[in-house]
Regions:
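Glycine-centered short loops/turns at secondary-structure junctions
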Residues: 60-63, 135, 161
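A charged, well-structured terminal subsegment
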Residues: 190-206
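Short glycine/serine/threonine-rich phosphate/pyrophosphate-binding segments
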Residues: 146-153
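Internal catalytic-core helix/loop-beta-alpha segment
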Residues: 95-144
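A short glycine-rich beta-strand->turn/loop micro-motif centered on a GG-aromatic cluster
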Residues: 140-143, 161-176
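Active-site acidic carboxylates
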Residues: 1-108, 112, 203-206
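Active-site-proximal loop->helix
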Residues: 174-187
């Protein structure tokens, strides 16, 4: 018996499917994650490019759209253990060019921008309330990194009882091994996995 057989025997990787009211969150596709000298690398640039198509679709069909940024005070007074573990995060202040959402995915009026100090889009923010106010029952999570802020957001999405979808070509990581391992684990326990084109086709079929 291989490891995948164990997951199958234990009943993981069931399909939850799309609900009637999806929303899209794009996690931390900011300038610093496009540059390997800061937080970039791996397949992040490809994921950004793929996400432009998903974002255009979401806008066309009228999904609520949210974007996240990690933003700390200029003096680091709101930083905690997360920033001690990765001190480079302290460069991500409100007006730093590094913390700005990439131009290809710039928010439009009416789209939420979540400023956060932790990995999850939900922790210490009003994101859950915003989703509830818009009647969302499904959350599509794109962004980076797959093993970090995407995963944390996915786990908290399920904790808020939302159907959760990860478009696999719209998430990225600075290294492929954690990207692949975390996609596997999220697919087993938390999210339905599909590509962006597969997701858009599934939505059109509803």
């Amino acid at each position: 018996m291989d490891e995948l057989d164990i997951y199958k025997r234990q009943g993981f990787a069931q399909t939850v499917g799309l609900g009637r009211s999806p929303a899209l969150v794009i996690v931390d596709f900011v300038v610093s994650f496009t540059d390997p000298a800061h937080f970039g690398g791996g397949n992040i640039l490809a994921a950004i490019d793929n996400t432009t198509h998903l974002l255009a679709f979401a806008r066309e069909v009228g999904w609520p759209v949210a974007h996240t940024r990690v933003v700390y005070a200029d003096d680091g007074s709101d930083a905690g253990v997360f920033a001690r573990k990765a001190p480079g995060l302290l460069k991500l202040t409100e007006h730093s060019p590094l913390s700005q959402i990439v131009s290809a995915l710039s928010p439009k009026p009416g789209e939420l921008v979540v400023r956060k100090q932790q990995a999850s889009a939900f922790f210490g923010t009003g994101f859950a309330t915003w989703l509830t106010g818009r009647g969302a029952d499904t959350l599509v999570v794109a962004g980076c990194t797959t093993s970090g802020c995407v995963r944390a957001t996915v786990v908290d999405s399920v904790a808020h009882n939302l159907r959760t979808i990860v478009p696999t070509d719209c998430v990225g990581d600075r290294a492929l091994a954690p990207h692949q391992a975390n996609l596997f684990d999220m697919g087993q326990k938390y999210a339905d996995l599909m590509t962006g084109p597969e997701l858009m086709a599934a939505c059109k079929a509803l």
